[in-house]
UniProtKB/Swiss-Prot annotation:
<feature type="binding site">
    <location>
        <position position="410"/>
    </location>
    <ligand>
        <name>[4Fe-4S] cluster</name>
    </ligand>
</feature>
<dbReference type="InterPro" id="IPR015931">
    <property type="entry name" value="Acnase/IPM_dHydase_lsu_aba_1/3"/>
</dbReference>
<comment type="pathway">
    <text>Amino-acid biosynthesis; L-leucine biosynthesis; L-leucine from 3-methyl-2-oxobutanoate: step 2/4.</text>
</comment>
<keyword id="KW-0100">Branched-chain amino acid biosynthesis</keyword>
<keyword id="KW-0028">Amino-acid biosynthesis</keyword>
<comment type="function">
    <text>Catalyzes the isomerization between 2-isopropylmalate and 3-isopropylmalate, via the formation of 2-isopropylmaleate.</text>
</comment>
<keyword id="KW-0004">4Fe-4S</keyword>
<dbReference type="GO" id="GO:0046872">
    <property type="term" value="F:metal ion binding"/>
</dbReference>
<feature type="binding site">
    <location>
        <position position="407"/>
    </location>
    <ligand>
        <name>[4Fe-4S] cluster</name>
    </ligand>
</feature>
<dbReference type="InterPro" id="IPR033941">
    <property type="entry name" value="IPMI_cat"/>
</dbReference>
<keyword id="KW-0408">Iron</keyword>
<dbReference type="InterPro" id="IPR001030">
    <property type="entry name" value="Acoase/IPM_deHydtase_lsu_aba"/>
</dbReference>
<comment type="similarity">
    <text>Belongs to the aconitase/IPM isomerase family. LeuC type 1 subfamily.</text>
</comment>
<dbReference type="InterPro" id="IPR004430">
    <property type="entry name" value="3-IsopropMal_deHydase_lsu"/>
</dbReference>
<dbReference type="InterPro" id="IPR036008">
    <property type="entry name" value="Aconitase_4Fe-4S_dom"/>
</dbReference>
<protein>
    <recommendedName>
        <fullName>3-isopropylmalate dehydratase large subunit</fullName>
        <ecNumber>4.2.1.33</ecNumber>
    </recommendedName>
</protein>
<feature type="binding site">
    <location>
        <position position="347"/>
    </location>
    <ligand>
        <name>[4Fe-4S] cluster</name>
    </ligand>
</feature>
Amino acid sequence: MAKTLYEKLFDAHVVYEAENETPLLYIDRHLVHEVTSPQAFNGLRAHGRPVRQPGKTFATMDHNVSTQTKDINACGEMARIQMQELIKNCKEFGVELYDLNHPYQGIVHVMGPEQGVTLPGMTIVCGDSHTATHGAFGALAFGIGTSEVEHVLATQTLKQGRAKTMKIEVQGKAAPGITAKDIVLAIIGKTGSAGGTGHVVEFCGEAIRDLSMEGRMTLCNMAIEMGAKTGLVAPDETTFNYVKGRLHAPKGKDFDDAVAYWKTLQTDEGATFDTVVTLQAEEISPQVTWGTNPGQVISVNDNIPDPASFADPVKRASAEKALAYMGLKPGIPLTEVAIDKVFIGSCTNSRIEDLRAAAEIAKGRKVAPGVQALVVPGSGPVKAQAEAEGLDKIFIEAGFEWRLPGCSMCLAMNNDRLNPGERCASTSNRNFEGRQGRGGRTHLVSPAMAAAAAVTGHFADIRNIK
């Protein structure tokens, strides 16, 4: 029977399945951070259980860390406790930890792929909703809760029901300057923030195949923002070339054997999806969210929508509420909306290609008066590479703040946050009320668009910046 990529990955990992029971899956990789792991390790301790497969468990610090100092005390008592607990737990249970002083420390979803921990064909879990990022490699990767974190630590397995399947095909070639962030925001604009609920999404089409691995990670990172369980891109030569030579990737003949298997991880001809969505890449322009969920998104050259234009009463009410929170009036051009802060970073857009794209706009320009702009590399290696290329100097000369790796202003769990009423052009993945700080107003954009907002002081079409 013809199978989708998701069905192949799921079936290959079933350890046990019985009638009227949820299948038990084997988990190949478990990524751990300081926020969702303390109670899980305490559960192991209380029952006298070891970590079943410490060699398949990798930990780092990211959510709570300061991006201005490596001092564990910098972000408050709760952050300090969580990080110290992670140090203690990893030492006690034999788990590899990339702590604040480790050169590989960084955002968990940047670190995993970078170190070759993430490989095609794997099942990967983490106590974080944006674990979908790793689906870019043709891996079945999804976020789990703290009780599930404990279960995986103890057994290296997890009960998981089968999801429905969705194919999102982006046909044709994207125009110059259109990034994976624009593509995925356009997709969510079409499906809505709940359009993928109950599904695993496979992204395909020429525009998707043209993306680098970093672009594919941005794409899959935001699958969760359309309500999907996770996102997938089938592995190809782009994938294999990215993985080859990385720290935890197979070497020599083992790598060749792995590639031979990875090449089978494609949706079979004739396989059927429960839902199919199609977009034309050439119709996608730079995207900016205007509301309080990622589905409330328009082209940079559009006007703020009028809630009255929504036929669905639920969408109309949601738009009214969003505009009130965001302090926006219907009908005004988006390019006239001024910003207070800019955040370039997060597990969505903090990799080297993202920083290069932002630096290209920043070079030779200055951050607009009254704007604070942060650039936060996703990991130690990203920071080191950016500095080797001189990107840090470009940003600093333009008036951006060059920071240490961490989740930073994506979420208000550290010192980087918005004050009430502040408006931010952000390369992160969520624009919910209060996500970046109580009363903060978040607009999601690509790295180049964020840099353009920083130097102009308002939203601007990067295609017009020469």
